[in-house]
């Protein structure tokens, strides 16, 4: 009842306050349906009915649609298109098959006929050859018979007849023997290829019949001289013909008669040539004309620069596109500058103009699909550099990412660069194309010839363990004891390596190689990263240390075999079995209780583990040395390294400090939010709006609708996700990431190598995947049950980690970072906390076989294990060379990993990512390890609520909880890439996480980036094309109304040299929800970014300069809001710094205020002084020290009051200053010497009115008693020199020498002391008036 009242009240409130209710009739029904769904969902939560969970999840999926659900729609459309294409192709294939069958039958008939003809020809040739070869012999036989007949002329006829009959019988008998002997020789003739197909009985009969007939014909010919001559001539011709015929037949036999296969191939080649010619003509016609294929309901129209695929002609008629322009120019206010000077940076821009010419309104979404990158290393040689760019592009093989994560994974070494291949050859790596038997034969030959050739290679040497003859002294017992006690598995091993002995020379060498810090250089191609075999003493130390710590019956000796070898080949099986037998033989000689040795193989990672029984101790370690040397003699040609297994433990905080309590009430630090640039300003998609007007308009829109957008994003997610999730998901902005791209993709697998997991947990069962038993795992059924099938979690650590990564989004428990991915939990911990490197490597091999792109490792050790190092290194060859990401926890000892490294977190491979823990106060957790050179990123690891066995939940703390957060974000990035149709490079995914992370400036413990992982920024960057291609965020999604257009800039910013390919897909959907119309525009892009290639033009041609006007379509408001707030950094509010800033701010304001007052007063005083100066020039009111009496001043003031009135100052300014000085201002310039002659008396009198003349007379009269002072003050006004502010000296001495020197007297008479040509004579009152008028004008100016 309460629920009904609650829902009804909400509907009424919505009805009252919603303005557009009257215009929308369907609004009420839609709101009732929405609240009904919420009510049903709430009832399920209250009832907690587990049986109803499946229907709840189905409702959840139907109502949950991410912002970029277009990928799902596009995938379904592509699936439909392929089905129709397959159907139409099937019909076409049936017709083609019929044609092919008819053609094949015709070919077979022709071949059979040709075979019969050839066989018949061969019969004729053989018969002729036999006939010719037997004719002479048979003739001699008949001659003998005829001679015997002619000797008895005298006998009667009867006697002759009997004798003739007997001779004929003998003749037939000898003829048969003659023919059989010739046929026997024919069978032994190697020149006859098809002799087994001949019927020799048939040949015998034919030859015998021909010879007899020929003999009878010759007997009928009677003698005579002419006839005999003819016969001899004939026989001679036959003999010559026989010789010629024999040569011809032998030549034919040597060349060989064409076989059936050859004839068939010739026929097929002829037919294929015909088909190629016809197809070539078809392809040329297709290139010249646009094609239009209608596969049922799917229409495909091909243009020069793009292809349209749709199920409706409306899109073809309404939408027009221009995708041909490639330019570096900017579009109006969207400025993307191009750096002409820096050739190392590359930008490519394509401007797409989309227009709607129809009557419908469409929703437009941009996507990228099938991106590919091909490294240029090894594609072309020096000779190929002469070729053009187009020819080089054609040589680049397109890699089809089929099946993606399906099937069985392998290690692909084909993409090794030239430097890597050279390094593997230096290490003794085998060419995968070379047969191992050939390699062994070469090794044997080298060993046999070793007496004459001293070789340093591994194949020519073998170990000789002999303490008496060893050149290098064995370490002392004390030194060995110290080494044993201070054993540490630092990767910087000693340079002591195994000592090799040349067998025949009996000379000894120390095989020394540069150690190289394997984790001090990210470049795997560095020649310093050479692997060396641990010497036997180190192996013995490892064995004794493991014996001390672990009481087991067997120890695991792991041998890392070369990656290119096939361990399942017969040769490698024989090599391993022989090594095993030799080792067993040695053990049986020294230990009677010993039975046999077992071993384990892991492929494709190529690790061999031999289980050594614990029969050795400190007393018989020499026997262990000898056993290891025997093993090395058998396998050193195939081994890269070897060592005994190490022990690893999980990272879970052992304790929680008081200040780390859950109920900590200490004040939290505050931070300010500042937007960050993902790329350089010239490439950033956040720095496109440079004009002020678009910025102001856009800000107004955002400010007016910001609150509504925030509510829309918040209400987008189901209530359960917000209720059951904790602070850790909100701090890394997972909600907005789900809003953009969804919960993930089931095809993406995350491999959790830990203590196992509860496979029956309600929050894990839906996402956990248990791989079926396969022989490729190469493990026993018991070991398979232990690691894969039933990974029982005794500690709960693995279950907790698994729940953080991918807890199912249901109505119970918690939600993981990526709730819709596939989880593979593998147990390598054999107890509650510890596990060996053999189990860890075996688990990594299972991850490789299952094509898992992400591996979580919330465990580690301070001992460097070379086996694990090599196993992690080989992860970069998974997924067809793309590589797998290894996310590792940094550790919980609050140590600096730069000084005290933990492994595998500090393996410096580009696909390994180390994670530290951060608290909810945006500080590195007190327990977390850090490292300015070894720890990459921060993630929540403080008080994380997640799953534990038996359907329970618990709070754990540690960096083990931080690493799975980064795994989950990586899974979201891989999910977006899967939707786009490709597998990204492992380094590129980690680079995206780094560049989009939130900078935490206030951290005291430093890391490489000092930043927090940002799920929203990483997903958004991947959706916009990744690192090298950036579609502007504001142009990715918008509505295209009738008559509108849109300019879409796409910027490519290549950060690696190579070949980039992708397809920009523009999805077109009508706004009408009932419409099933859908279309896509595919724009292929291919860029070569190696400036060293000839004919490479880094700067594309100049294109059109577009201008954005009012006809431009509007951006999507929600997406634009996300784009503005997706990438930012946090800066801490420092209270002391803030207080100091406030004080300085107010001091600045105060100083500005005081300065303004001072300037105002200064300006007022200057104005007053200028007026007083004018007055003082005509009214001699001087300062203190004037000789004028107070009574004289009062008289003068009284006179001016009578003259100008009471308002003396105002009238004086108006009547005297303006009228008197304005006329002369035009003719008199400041700083110049006045010309007293240029004005006449009349002019001066006209310009000087009566009041001014009176004033001048008063001034002259009053100057009588102080002429010296007055003269100086009157002439002081001439000391200003215009704009140049140049001062002139107008004292008495200078004036008398250069210009004028006036002398005033009581009679108002001016006399000149020195007479010059240019001086003025003053002799009367008129002259005085004239001179004083000129002086007045000068002073006024």
From Swiss-Prot:
Quote the Pfam families the UniProt record gives.
Peptidase_S8, Pro_sub2
UniProt EC number:
3.4.21.62
Q: How does it sit in the membrane?
A: Single-pass type I membrane protein
Q: Where are the transmembrane segments?
A: 1137-1157
Name the reaction it catalyses.
Answer: Hydrolysis of proteins with broad specificity for peptide bonds, and a preference for a large uncharged residue in P1. Hydrolyzes peptide amides
Q: Where is the composition biased (Basic and acidic residues)?
A: 502-515
Q: Where is the composition biased (Low complexity)?
A: 430-474, 517-530
Regulation of this protein's activity per its record: Activation may be calcium-dependent. Inhibited by the non-covalent interaction with the cleaved propeptide.
Please list which residues make up the signal peptide. 1-18
InterPro entries noted in UniProt: Peptidase_S8/S53_dom (IPR000209), Peptidase_S8/S53_dom_sf (IPR036852), Peptidase_S8/S53_subtilisin (IPR051048), Peptidase_S8_His-AS (IPR022398), Peptidase_S8_Ser-AS (IPR023828), Peptidase_S8_subtilisin-rel (IPR015500), Pro_sub2 (IPR040935)
Q: How is it modified after translation?
A: Proteolytically cleaved at the N-terminus to generate a 74kDa intermediate which is further processed into a 72kDa form. The first maturation cleavage is autocatalytic, occurs in the ER and is necessary for the subsequent SUB2 trafficking to the microneme. The second cleavage may be mediated by PMX/plasmepsin X.
Q: What's the superkingdom here?
A: Eukaryota
Function, as annotated, reads: Serine protease which plays an essential role in the shedding of AMA1, MSP1 and MSP7 from the surface of the invading merozoite; this step is essential for productive invasion and the release of the adhesion between the erythrocyte and the merozoite. May cleave TRAMP/PTTRAMP, thereby shedding TRAMP from the merozoite surface during erythrocyte invasion.
The cross-references to PANTHER family, in alphabetical order and at most eight, read: CELL WALL-ASSOCIATED PROTEASE, SUBTILISIN-RELATED
Record's family?
A: Belongs to the peptidase S8 family.
Instruction: State what protein this is by name.
Output: Subtilisin-like protease 2
Which organism's genome codes for this protein? Plasmodium falciparum (isolate 3D7)
State the gene name recorded for this protein. SUB2
């Amino acid at each position: 009842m309460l629920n009904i009242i609650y829902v009804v009240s909400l509907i009424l409130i919505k009805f009252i306050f919603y303005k557009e209710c009257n215009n929308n009739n369907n609004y009420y029904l839609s709101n009732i349906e929405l609240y009904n769904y919420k009510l049903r969902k709430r009832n399920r939560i209250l009832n907690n009915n587990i049986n109803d969970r499946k229907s709840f999840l189905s409702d959840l999926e139907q109502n949950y649609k991410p912002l970029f659900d277009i990928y799902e729609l596009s995938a379904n459309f592509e699936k439909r298109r392929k089905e129709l294409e397959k159907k139409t192709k099937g019909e076409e294939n049936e017709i083609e098959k019929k044609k092919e069958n008819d053609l094949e039958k015709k070919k077979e008939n022709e071949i059979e006929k040709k075979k019969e003809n050839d066989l018949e020809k061969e019969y004729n040739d053989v018969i002729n050859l036999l006939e010719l070869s037997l004719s002479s012999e048979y003739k001699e036989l008949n001659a003998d018979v005829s001679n015997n007949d002619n000797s008895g002329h005298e006998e009667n006829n009867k006697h002759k007849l009997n004798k003739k009959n007997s001779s004929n019988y003998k003749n037939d008998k000898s003829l048969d023997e003659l023919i059989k002997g010739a046929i026997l020789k024919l069978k032994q003739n190697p020149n006859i290829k098809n002799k087994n197909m001949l019927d020799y009985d048939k040949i015998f009969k034919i030859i015998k019949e021909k010879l007899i007939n020929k003999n009878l014909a010759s007997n009928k010919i009677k003698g005579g001289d002419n006839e005999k001559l003819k016969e001899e001539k004939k026989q001679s011709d036959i003999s010559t013909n026989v010789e010629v015929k024999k040569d011809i037949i032998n030549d034919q036999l040597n060349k060989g008669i064409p076989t059936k296969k050859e004839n068939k191939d010739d026929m097929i080649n002829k037919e294929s040539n015909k088909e190629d010619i016809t197809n070539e003509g078809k392809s040329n016609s297709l290139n010249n004309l646009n094609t239009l294929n209608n596969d049922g309901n799917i229409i495909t129209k091909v243009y020069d620069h793009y292809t349209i695929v749709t199920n409706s002609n409306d899109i073809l008629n309404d939408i027009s596109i221009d995708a041909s322009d490639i330019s570096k120019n900017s579009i109006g206010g969207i400025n993307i500058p191009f750096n002409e000077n820096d050739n190392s940076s590359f930008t490519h821009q394509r401007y797409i103009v989309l227009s709607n010419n129809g009557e419908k309104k469409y929703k437009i979404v941009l996507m990228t699909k099938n991106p590919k990158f091909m490294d240029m290393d090894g594609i072309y040689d020096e000779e190929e550099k002469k070729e053009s760019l187009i020819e080089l592009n054609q040589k680049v093989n397109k890699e089809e990412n089929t099946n993606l994560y399906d099937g069985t994974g392998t290690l692909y070494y084909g993409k090794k660069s030239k430097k890597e291949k050279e390094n593997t050859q230096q290490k003794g790596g085998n060419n995968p194309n070379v047969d191992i038997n050939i390699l062994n034969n070469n090794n044997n030959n080298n060993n046999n010839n070793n007496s004459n050739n001293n070789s340093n290679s591994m194949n020519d040497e073998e170990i000789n363990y002999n303490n008496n003859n060893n050149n290098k002294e064995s370490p002392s017992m004390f030194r060995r004891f110290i080494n044993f006690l201070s054993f540490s598995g630092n990767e910087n091993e000693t340079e002591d390596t195994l000592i090799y002995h040349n067998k025949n020379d009996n000379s000894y060498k120390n095989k020394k190689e540069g150690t190289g810090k394997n984790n001090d250089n990210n470049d795997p191609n560095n020649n310093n990263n050479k692997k060396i075999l641990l010497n036997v003493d180190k192996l013995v130390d490892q064995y004794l240390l493991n014996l001390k710590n672990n009481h087991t019956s067997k120890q695991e000796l792991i041998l890392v075999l070369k990656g290119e070898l096939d361990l399942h080949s017969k040769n490698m099986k024989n090599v391993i079995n022989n090594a095993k037998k030799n080792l067993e033989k040695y053990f049986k000689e020294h230990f009677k209780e010993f039975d046999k040795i077992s071993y384990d193989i892991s492929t494709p990672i190529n690790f061999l583990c031999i289980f050594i029984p614990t029969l050795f101790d400190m007393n018989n370690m020499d026997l262990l040395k000898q056993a290891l040397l025997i093993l090395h003699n058998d396998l050193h040609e195939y081994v890269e390294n070897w060592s005994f297994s190490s022990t690893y433990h999980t990272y879970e905080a052992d304790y929680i400090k008081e200040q780390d309590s859950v109920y900590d009430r200490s004040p939290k630090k505050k931070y300010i939010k500042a937007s960050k640039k993902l790329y350089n300003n010239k490439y950033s998609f956040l720095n496109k709006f440079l004009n002020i007007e678009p910025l102001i308009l856009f800000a107004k829109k955002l400010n007016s609708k910001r609150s509504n957008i925030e509510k829309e994003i918040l209400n987008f997610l189901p209530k359960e996700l917000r209720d059951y999730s904790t602070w850790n998901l909100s701090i890394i902005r997972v909600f907005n990431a789900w809003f953009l791209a969804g919960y993930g993709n089931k095809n993406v697998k995350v491999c959790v190598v830990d203590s196992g997991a509860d496979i029956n947990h309600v929050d894990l069962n839906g996402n956990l995947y248990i791989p079926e038993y396969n022989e490729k795992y190469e493990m026993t059924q018991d070991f398979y049950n232990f690691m894969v099938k039933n990974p029982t979690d005794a500690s709960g650590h693995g279950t907790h980690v698994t729940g953080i990564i991918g807890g199912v989004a249901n109505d119970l428990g918690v939600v993981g970072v990526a709730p819709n991915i596939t989880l593979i939990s593998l147990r390598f911990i054999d107890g509650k906390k510890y596990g060996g490197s053999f189990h860890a490597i075996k688990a990594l091999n299972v991850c490789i076989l299952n094509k898992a792109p992400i591996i979580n490792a919330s465990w580690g050790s301070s001992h460097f294990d070379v086996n694990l190092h090599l196993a992690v290194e080989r992860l970069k060859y998974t997924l067809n060379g793309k590589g797998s990401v290894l996310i590792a926890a940094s550790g919980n000892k609050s140590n600096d990993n730069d000084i005290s490294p933990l492994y595998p977190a500090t393996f410096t491979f580009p696909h390994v990512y180390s994670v530290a823990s951060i608290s909810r106060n945006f500080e590195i957790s007190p327990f977390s390890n850090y490292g300015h050179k070894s720890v990459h990123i921060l993630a929540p690891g403080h008080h994380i609520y997640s799953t534990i066995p038996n359907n329970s939940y618990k709070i754990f703390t540690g960096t083990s909880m931080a690493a799975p957060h980064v795994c989950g974000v990586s899974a979201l990035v891989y999910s977006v890439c899967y939707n786009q149709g490709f597998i990204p490079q492992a380094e590129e995914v980690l680079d995206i996480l780094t560049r989009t992370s939130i900078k935490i400036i206030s951290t005291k413990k430093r890391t490489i980036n000092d930043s927090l992982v940002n799920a929203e920024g990483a997903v958004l960057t991947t959706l916009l094309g990744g690192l090298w291609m950036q579609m502007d965020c504001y142009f990715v999604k918008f509505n295209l109304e009738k008559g509108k257009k849109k300019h879409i800039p796409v910027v490519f910013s290549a950060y690696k040299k190579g070949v980039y390919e992708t397809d920009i897909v523009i999805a077109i959907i009508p706004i009408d929800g009932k419409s099933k119309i859908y279309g896509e525009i595919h724009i292929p892009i291919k860029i070569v970014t190696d400036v060293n290639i000839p004919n490479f033009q880094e700067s594309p041609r100049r294109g059109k300069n577009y201008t954005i006007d009012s006809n431009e379509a509007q951006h999507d408001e929600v997406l634009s809001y996300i784009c503005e707030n997706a990438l930012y950094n946090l800066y801490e509010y420092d209270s002391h710094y803030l207080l100091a800033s406030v004080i300085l701010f107010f001091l600045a304001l105060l100083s500005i205020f005081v300065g303004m007052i001072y300037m105002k007063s200064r300006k007022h005083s200057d104005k007053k002084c200028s007026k007083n100066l004018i007055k003082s020039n005509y009214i001699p009111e001087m300062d203190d020290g004037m000789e004028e009496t107070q009574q004289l001043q009062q008289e003068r003031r009284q006179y001016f009051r009578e003259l100008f009135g009471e308002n003396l100052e105002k009238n004086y300014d108006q009547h005297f200053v303006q009228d008197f000085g304005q006329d002369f201002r035009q003719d008199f310039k400041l700083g110049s010497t006045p010309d007293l002659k240029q004005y006449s008396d009349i002019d001066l009198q006209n310009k000087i009115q009566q009041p001014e003349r009176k004033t001048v007379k008063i001034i002259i009269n009053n100057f009588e008693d102080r002429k010296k002072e007055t003269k100086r003050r009157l002439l002081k006004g001439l000391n200003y020199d215009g704009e140049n502010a140049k001062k002139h000296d107008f004292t008495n001495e200078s004036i008398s020498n250069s210009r004028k020197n006036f002398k005033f007297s009581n009679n108002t008479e001016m006399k000149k002391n020195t007479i010059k040509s240019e001086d003025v004579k003053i002799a009367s009152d008129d002259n005085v008036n004239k001179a004083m008028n000129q002086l007045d004008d000068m002073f006024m100016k």
